[in-house]
């Protein structure tokens, strides 16, 4: 640390105290005029953080030196949809630090659980602001931050801040008031219209959404998967082994991610018939449908529905629950169709090859897809 570090204070602006918000706006306009000239005003912060956002009140934290704002961080409440599950999330944004305060700084109060002023959260403005902001979100039941980290901040999020990266396809509710804030902030009449509009889109969110592939970070520890208990008398049913049989695998089209794999054996003779894959960060109540080579394994929220091996041992078409499945060994692929009432969607997996050695597996897959099956997805 510098011999005479500048001492910073943390201020929480969730209730939007006028004086400090004005200081924050001045900070943006002075330090980042190109980024803030059209948006950084009181209406911008109000639409993100107060009750105008139907997803919930947001979070706003600033760092202060000598009465002036020198760093900011906001977290805007969002609602994501994954299958039939509503996920509480926040979008981190407006995380700016004065260029003159990125070194030789120290916070007046140690972060809870730390013991030294030289620890990261007691001297990094970015780390302290992000952590203080997300601590309050987490206390309100928020589990995820989406749209973060970008490439520049990724190492800090996943390294120093100890978050975990989770990939997935989520549906984003467009009901956030921030979409209309620039329109209705100019007058009370337009603001009232904007609030009505966001309430309507909130009710119709499932009909007015956009699809995004986004990165999520969660500081929560991974849930432990329960030991599966399968009662089966048919000899051609397959059995899940316990967690001691898990091994690690990597996919060549996504080498940065690790997946867990459970070995599947026939109950009658312990013959190996396939592997069940799931993301390392998948929750126990959020299983996915996964396909590999000749084997299809099917999990529906904790209740385990397993397709008998005999049904997928040869080239043929068959139906299982609301899935229509084609197995084509000649093309070394599986194609399946998920039915949504009158709608359907086709998925295909092309297998390039596989090599499993001992307790470490390496797979080569091309166009690997998965599809989440919830209680009402295929009703």
Residue ranges with predicted function:
Residues 97, 102-137, 301-314:
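Conserved acetyl-CoA-binding loop-helix of GNAT-fold acetyltransferases
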Residues 66-67, 135-143, 210, 266-270:
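Secondary-structure boundary elements
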Residues 7-100, 150-152, 216-296:
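A conserved beta-strand-loop-helix scaffold within acyl/acetyltransferase catalytic domains
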Residues 117-125, 145, 181, 235, ...:
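Conserved aromatic-histidine-acidic binding/catalytic patches
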Residues 32-36, 138-142, 162:
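Hydrophobic/aromatic-lined pockets within catalytic cores
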Residues 73, 93-96, 126-134, 138, ...:
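Short, well-ordered alpha-helical packing segments
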Residues 187-224:
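Extended, charge-rich helix/loop segments that form flexible
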Residues 2-5, 43, 143-199, 250-253, ...:
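Active-site/acyl-donor-binding loops of N-acyltransferases
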